[in-house]
Regions:
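Hydrophobic, membrane-interfacing alpha helices
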Residues: 1-264
Length: 264
């Protein structure tokens, strides 16, 4: 048994390897689960509900993220190497595809449990930002999802730990640590939601929709720095999806408040 036999492998037992990519996803998912449990208990729901929900939504999200990635990388990679489709330990999870798949699963799950969708969304979505922030570190260990080339002096100006600077030296050049930009951005959005939006929200569902606004803004700007964007013709797919998320979030809050005014 070896811990960290390579920088991107957490544990090796014989032929079994546990990659840091998986560890980061598991840590993020666990934190999101615990935050969700805390919020559900405050709302008076049984902890068993989220336990039943968690595994299903996690698997659905991972499958959706993989399918999204494979679709847009089909010609470049998977058409000629179909055996790589299941090799998620090599990276290649497009989080926006996972979000969409998880939303569909969540809608039907909570409908079956007779729990209002926006109530569940407010309880769960802030924690998703923590999961995403942790998951981005998996990209760091996999040397993927990095940005365009920059100078060493630029990275030093950011006052980054040396191990991050060292691992941003990829393919003969230093690169923007876009994984870190998005990770920090997601944490900031999380804090804004729980410290500001939660206190000032006029309607149930505003935290849910604020997630899409905040995450959409962060991802749109970070994506502009990346070199590995999934493309739809000349358009960066993640930026297009981010715009859709932002519009949906703003429209959702507007509709909720408008509906509230009509009721009162």
């Amino acid at each position: 048994m070896q811990f960290f036999p390579e920088y991107n492998i957490f544990l090796k037992i014989g032929g079994l390897q546990i990659h840091m990519y998986a560890v980061c996803i598991i840590i993020g998912a666990f934190i999101a689960y615990m935050l969700g449990q805390y919020n559900f208990k405050k709302l008076g729901y049984s902890s068993e509900i989220l336990s039943d929900y968690f595994f299903g939504v996690l698997m659905t999200g991972i499958i959706g993220a993989r399918i999204w990635y494979v679709i847009f990388m089909w010609k470049e990679l998977y058409m000629s190497h179909p055996e790589e489709i299941i090799a998620i330990w090599h990276g290649g999870l497009a989080i926006q595809g996972g979000i969409i798949a998880a939303l569909i699963y969540s809608y039907y799950f909570f409908k079956k449990k007779d729990i209002p969708f926006f109530v569940a969304g407010d309880a769960i979505m802030p924690g998703v930002l923590i999961a995403q922030a942790c998951g981005r570190w998996g990209n760091f260990f996999n040397h993927e999802a990095f940005g365009s080339a920059v100078s060493l002096n630029f990275l030093k100006l950011l006052h980054l730990p040396q191990f991050i600077i060292n691992n941003m030296y990829i393919e003969g050049a230093y690169h923007h640590p876009t994984f870190l930009y998005e990770s920090v951005g997601n944490l900031i959005v999380f804090l804004v939601i729980i410290l500001v939006v939660k206190k000032k929200a006029q309607c149930t569902g505003e935290q849910f929709f604020s997630y899409f606004i905040g995450y959409g803004i962060v991802r749109f700007f970070v994506e502009g720095l990346r070199t590995d964007s999934l493309m739809l013709g000349p358009i960066r797919m993640a930026q297009l999806t981010s715009i859709v998320f932002i519009i949906a979030g703003v429209a959702g809050i507007y509709c909720l408040r408008n509906h509230q005014k009509r009721k009162s």
